Design a protein with these regions (language model features):
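Non-catalytic signal-transmission and effector/linker regions of two-component phosphorelay proteins
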Residues: 1-3
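Conserved acidic carboxylate
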Residues: 8
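Two-component/phosphorelay signaling modules centered on CheY-like receiver
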Residues: 11-35
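Acidic, metal-coordinating helix/loop segments flanking the phosphotransfer/catalytic sites
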Residues: 18, 36-55
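Acidic catalytic/metal-coordinating carboxylates
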Residues: 39, 66-69
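Conserved phosphotransfer cores of two-component systems
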Residues: 48-51, 73-80
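Receiver (REC) domain active-site loop signature in two-component systems and cognate sites
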Residues: 60-62
């Protein structure tokens, strides 16, 4: 089972991405678990638990800490997430 995180500050996009990913994965007969986060700060608060995810989708334009900076911080924690 794939573990996926979606990090976007806009609820509409988080929900839409989750639906699209779920539909795609179901079409490939692949089980997945999808968690959603409202900010890079919320996601980064997981610290080492971030490594539970196989894939993380990040919004580039977010308040406080953007997707690029969030990705840099994730890489400091783990290099095993795409």
């Amino acid at each position: 089972m794939l573990s996926i995180a979606i990090c976007d500050d806009e609820e509409y996009f988080r929900t839409t991405e989750k639906k699209l990913i779920s539909k795609y994965m179901a079409g490939k007969n692949c089980e997945c678990m999808i968690d959603m986060y409202e900010s890079g700060k919320e996601l980064l608060a997981l610290r080492s638990a971030i490594s539970q995810y196989n894939i993380i989708f990040l919004d580039v334009n977010m308040e406080e800490i953007d997707g690029i900076e969030t990705a840099k911080e994730i890489r400091k924690i783990t290099k095993d997430v795409f």
